[in-house]
């Protein structure tokens, strides 16, 4: 069966909500809305005011996880401050899924590279997941988007190093890139199943 593709020349918050409602999908239970908070000083992140109609429509909570590398997103305190700086906290409740450990370990029985995924334990508090992504070139993952949001984005700080290192966190920046990409696919599979 062919997939339906929706396209609009008009890009507004109202048009995105209209297109979402065309899907006719109801997300059951408590909804996590995965976003990328954006890096400090960078303008390449989704704007919270643009997504407010969709978030309000599904009644979701904005979620994210801390990073595995130094910066303004590697601790809960700094990351929440960045969410505030970028405007997310002005509109929404933000839940950092890995704010407190221990990690939730998801099995990946059919994983091609990794057989476990380490995610923020607060993921267990949600019944549904809506991923909001912006497409971008990424130096390690090829492209950043929904697959990266479902894998690296849901992973705890340790989980991010585990995925980047293709199962060996110490190789976070040196693992084979094809194995890293396969690890991302494995991790994403564990989140959606």
Positions of PLM-derived features:
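N-terminal and secondary-structure boundary signal
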Residues: 1-193
């Amino acid at each position: 069966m062919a997939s339906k593709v929706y396209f609009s020349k008009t890009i507004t918050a109202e048009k995105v909500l209209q297109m979402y409602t065309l899907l006719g999908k109801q997300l059951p239970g408590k909804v996590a809305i995965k976003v990328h908070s954006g890096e400090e000083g960078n303008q390449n992140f989704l704007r919270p005011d643009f997504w407010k109609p969709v978030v309000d429509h599904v009644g979701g909570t904005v979620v994210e996880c801390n990073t595995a590398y130094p910066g303004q997103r590697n601790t809960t305190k700094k990351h929440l401050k960045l969410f505030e700086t970028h405007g997310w906290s002005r509109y929404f409740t933000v839940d950092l899924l890995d704010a407190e450990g221990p990690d939730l370990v998801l099995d990946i029985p059919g994983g091609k590279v990794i057989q476990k995924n380490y995610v923020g334990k607060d993921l267990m508090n949600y019944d549904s997941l809506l991923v909001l992504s912006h497409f971008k070139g990424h130096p390690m993952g090829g492209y950043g988007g929904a697959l990266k949001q479902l894998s690296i984005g849901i992973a705890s700080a340790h989980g991010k190093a585990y995925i980047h290192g293709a199962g060996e966190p110490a190789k976070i920046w040196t693992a084979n890139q094809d194995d890293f990409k396969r690890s991302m696919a494995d991790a994403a599979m564990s989140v959606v199943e």
